[in-house]
Regions:
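Pro/Thr/Ser/Gly-rich low-complexity, intrinsically disordered linker/stalk tracts
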Residues: 1-28, 63, 75-94
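Recognizes extended acidic, P/S/T-rich segments that occur
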Residues: 31-64, 76-83
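Low-complexity, Ser/Thr/Pro/Gly-enriched N-terminal "stalk/linker" regions
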Residues: 92-133, 177-179, 183-184
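Well-ordered alpha-helical scaffold segments within catalytic/enzyme domains
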Residues: 94-95, 139-154, 169, 209-224
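Extended ligand-binding clefts on enzyme/binding-domain cores
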Residues: 97-102, 177-208, 223-275
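Extended, well-ordered alpha-helical scaffold segments
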Residues: 99-111, 154-171, 217, 223-245
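Membrane helical hairpin/interfacial module
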Residues: 131-139, 143-200
Length: 275
């Protein structure tokens, strides 16, 4: 039998409520079913969530509206677990500052909770491709995690553990004269030529976005303990090994070039100009 989900919180904003539960083993779960009540007595199903999801956002469209929630797990034979415990929250008028906090925390959660689990980096949001990471977006996510630590959304130690995972993965991932590809398989570290066979090597734009985030993290983790020293050493090694001058293609070129392929060289031949 499936265990009842454990609800962690219901958090209200001006016109919607977020609920969150502890994820369970996914093998036997087809989906989670969310129930809502406005009186705490009569509940109606309002949504389902796939087993890899552990949040639901309920848009009520009103200020001052209280709602109660329960969640169940449903298996592939459509057997349903017992109800979770009940959580409730009430929407309220938000200040501009509270609105900005809400947006910032949601942005952080996208990268923190939605990361590819083996690498800790940002997934490319393509249906059916749960293990493909986007390196440029990962740079944005790295900055979001640093902000999340500073804002208290997670602890510094939680952030440190994530960055040890990220840097360890990147050290082993495919690189092309130090640069990374646009897409990487999060389970193997191998390049994914998603845009076609010519796009199977270094991508200097995505590399730049990634390293902007990494260098931000390198400066942020400045404590003199073994873990933060390791993060700094790893990031130093990664960025110092990027051969930016290689991507000029020609010695006297005034331009950098976007792509380089290990078997087709400069076949795309795209100059980085006009920016």
């Amino acid at each position: 039998a499936l265990n009842a989900p454990v609800l962690q919180e219901a958090k209200a904003y001006e016109r919607h409520i977020d609920i969150k539960w502890i994820p369970q083993s996914k093998e036997d779960i087809k989906y989670y079913r969310i129930y809502r009540s406005f009186d705490g007595v009569t509940y109606q199903p309002v949504a389902i969530r796939r087993p890899w999801m552990n949040r639901y956002t309920d848009f009520l469209g009103e200020v001052g509206k209280k709602a109660y929630y329960k969640v169940t797990a449903v298996d592939y034979a459509l057997n349903e677990s017992n109800d979770s415990q009940t959580v409730s929250a009430t929407t309220y008028p938000m200040t501009d500052e509270q609105l900005l906090d809400m947006v910032q925390e949601a942005n952080f959660r996208y990268y923190w909770e939605g990361a590819e689990p083996n690498s800790g980096l940002a997934r490319e949001n393509i249906p059916g491709r749960n293990d493909m990471i986007a390196t440029g977006a990962s740079g944005f996510g790295i900055m979001a995690i640093v902000a999340g630590i500073e804002r208290g959304f997670i602890t510094r130690e939680e952030g440190v553990q994530r960055f040890l995972k990220i840097t360890s993965f990147l050290e082993k991932a495919d690189k092309f004269h130090g640069a990374v590809s646009h897409f990487i398989d999060g389970t193997t570290g191998k390049t994914v030529a998603f845009f076609g066979p010519k796009d199977n090597g270094g991508d200097l734009v995505e590399t730049s976005f990634l390293f902007q985030g990494l260098l931000t993290a390198r400066q942020y983790f400045d404590q003199e303990n073994d873990k933060e020293k390791q993060i700094r050493r790893s990031i130093d090694s990664l960025w110092k090994n990027v051969e930016w001058s290689w991507y000029k293609q020609f010695k006297d070129s005034p331009y950098l070039y976007w792509h380089w392929s290990p078997d087709q060289a400069w076949v795309i031949n795209h100059k980085l100009i006009g920016w």
